[in-house]
Amino acid sequence: LNLPGNNMSSRVDLKMVKDSAFQLSVQPFLGIEVFRAEISVDSVKVIDRMNKRYVADNYANLKGQTPIEFNFYNLQALFTNRLFLPGQQGISPKLYNRFKLKQDGPAAEIQVKDVMGLLYTFMADGEEKILSTCISEPSDRYALQWDYADFRLADGQPFPMRMDVQVMKDGASQGGVTLHFSRMQTDVPVKMDFSIPAKYKRITLSQIIKSLSSNKM
């Protein structure tokens, strides 16, 4: 995790159930969890165990709290290195004409805009791997840059074992996170638990983000 004046490295466990939910567990000290987040099709839940507080809200209430908006399926596609169409669960052949394609030899640039005017730019190589995804707002001042590297075969398909995610403002990084996957398992039973202790205080997602930006770890 890289924020202005605040850097932290940690073990993170990521669990995902396709088209349902995924869960992140941050364990920086000897496997002791300090932070957990679960994102489902319609809601976001976060537990901050160090400060005994939590977030539980649906996407409708979160609108306006984050500079970039996309649905669960779009976020799932970012984590699984897939092309996606803003606001859609999948891409059917009848939607192909919404994309603009530019090719330069084996490389390709694929672009699409959503109803808010956000521009989604996907860069792909000759093997049809997504190398990066950039989501920028109309003025091009703010953007989310998601880069993929260190591709290895998983179930016969290339998967990026490194993901670098940066929030950009005027072309400069304002903070981000780099994910290094040590291993990946697919098609295995997944148990997701998100019990919230009764004494924890409920707060908003914006309060969590503000805290991460202002406190040193």
What is each model feature region?
Residues 21-77:
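An acidic-aromatic
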